[in-house]
Amino acid sequence: LTYVFEMEETTFFKHYSEKQQENTLIDICIQAQKKVNRLVPEVPFSNIWIAKETADRIPANSVIHFGILNSLRSWNFFETPEDVLCYANTGGFGIDGCLSSCIGAAISNPKKEHYLIIGDLAFFYDLNSICNAIPCNVHILLVNNGVGTEFKNYDNRAAMFEMDADPFMAAKGHNGFRNSELVKKLCANLGVMY
C-alpha cells in the first residue's frame, strides 16, 4: 500500500457523486441497437422475429420467464415494457427447469400474470411440471420449431458439425417435432387450456 487517504465515507461518496455521470457504454449500446434495427428492418420468421413482434406487447405489470439460451438471447435485442419483470432460470445453464420455475413463480406470486417463452426441447424436457395443477396466471408461448436452434448458432460448438448436429445434438425430429396436435392433445389430457 503506497497511499492512504483517511476521511469519512460521506466525504468520499459526496465528492464522487457530484461528478457528472458518464453513461458512455450504455449510449454506445443504444446507438449500436438502433443501427442494427435500421440495417435489418425485416427479420425473417425465427426466434428473433417472435421476440421482435411480442416484446412490447407483454401486458404491463406482468412477469416474463425465458427458456435458457436462445429464447433469452433473442429477447435481449428488444425492449419490454418498463414495469415487466424478466427472469431466466440459468442455474443449470441447460434446458432443465424453465417450465417448472415459471409455474413455481406463478404459484408464489398469484397477483401477476406470468409468461413463459420456451423452445420445444426445453418444454418437452420439463413436461412433467404441467402434469400437476397449473395456476391460471401462467401463459406459455411454445416455440415449436422441431430443433434446438441454439445448436445452429455460429458460436456453439455443435455448429461445426453442420447438418450432422441435427440428430445428435440439436435433437431434430424429436418426439414433439413441430407437432402442434401432440401438444394440443397433451394439454387436453392434462386439463390445461391450449
Predicted regions and their residues:
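Glycine-rich, acidic loop regions that bind phosphate or pyrophosphate groups
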Residues: 1-29, 133-135, 146, 155, ...
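Thiamine diphosphate
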Residues: 77-194
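Hydrophobic beta-strand segments of well-ordered beta-sheets in folded domains
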Residues: 1-4, 62-64, 137-140
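Structural signal for hydrophobic packing residues in well-ordered secondary-structure cores
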Residues: 17-20, 58, 62, 191
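Active-site diphosphate/adenylate-binding microenvironment
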Residues: 30-111
